[in-house]
């Protein structure tokens, strides 16, 4: 290749890189600015956060580097990996090649090596043991969904949120500043059969205290919502009709969305958000 042509290509690549860097900077600024709006929205409601973004119950070891966090977030996008983690947590000590209920043996081995590489699991004989004695995937799933709001929807988010003096009690799993409004998401790592009407009622009470513009009840499953979750909402709030939006996505009342994981959590939230915007 002629030197002149190579130089032109280098200049073009450099300009493209600068455009990408500028775009990333604009996106980062948008997210950071949105964080101020999120805090302002909570302050307007008289809500004082005394805990958020806890790390003590995450799969990641304390002080995990950013690279490990990014790699975990990327792999959590795979539903099969999330199911694999549930089995690993249930067992505590496990042989990666045996966790093949939801993935191939090759994938199970890759997942095991990955957990070891980020410090989330340590070898013990011919098996692995999770580094932290977590009892549920729930907190890590909340962490993941908060990041998903930020990365995929450019919505600043906090997770595992507790407020002082709030009668509703319990954690608010994820709170985000989404599309210029306050949004609240409950995140369930249990399959539908493990969810009861009391949990739906508690979610609805927290929603009433927070007064978000829209809220999501996210169940990390590809199973049907109509069979178990929809009847729970109908029992907990009979005055709020539940309507099907598409496949297994539903709206309860004005702006509460029932979401599962089929076709991806981010894609399903986008579909709900579009429906919400069209009705405004």
Model-identified regions with their sequence ranges:
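Intrinsically disordered, low-complexity Ser/Thr/Pro/Gly-rich regulatory segments
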Residues: 2-280
